[in-house]
Amino acid sequence: MRFLLALALVACTRAPADPPLPTDITLKTGDQHAIRGLTVTFVGVKEDSRCPDNARCVWAGNAAVELRIEGGADSAAITLNSGVEPKSIGVQGLRFTIASLLPTPVIGAPAPASHDLTLHVEATR
């Protein structure tokens, strides 16, 4: 019985394993996520000129998001775009690309206070 209790305690204290790649991670504005020795923070939306849900557009537009990526002593602010370059960035063997940004704009609605960003993460090597 003591052995099982000790085993259960050890299992509960282990850090979760990194997910297999490729994977998607979803962050709310201000959230951070650790993956493969890096910490990715979704700082916010810098620009959102995507075509609103209730409009017809000749161009899909662009969403620009600001990320902070930290690994060890290194830290960088990075801007990724949905419609123009750079659409992805490679950092320490990982490539980050915007998979989705919600909510999408709506004509006549105020800009949302927070967004949900889904990043696609894959190995570059």
Please give the residue ranges for each predicted region.
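Bacterial signal peptide processing site
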Residues: 13-16
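C-terminal motif of bacterial Sec signal peptides marking the signal peptidase cleavage site
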Residues: 9-11
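Sec-dependent signal peptide recognition
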Residues: 1-6
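Envelope-exposed proteins and targeting segments
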Residues: 31, 36-38, 61-65, 92-94, ...
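Short Fe-S-cluster ligation motifs
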Residues: 81-100
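Short, exposed beta-strand-loop hairpins at the edges of beta-sheets
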Residues: 100-114, 118-122
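N-terminal secretory signal peptides
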Residues: 20-60
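Mature extracytoplasmic domains of secretory-pathway proteins
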Residues: 47-81
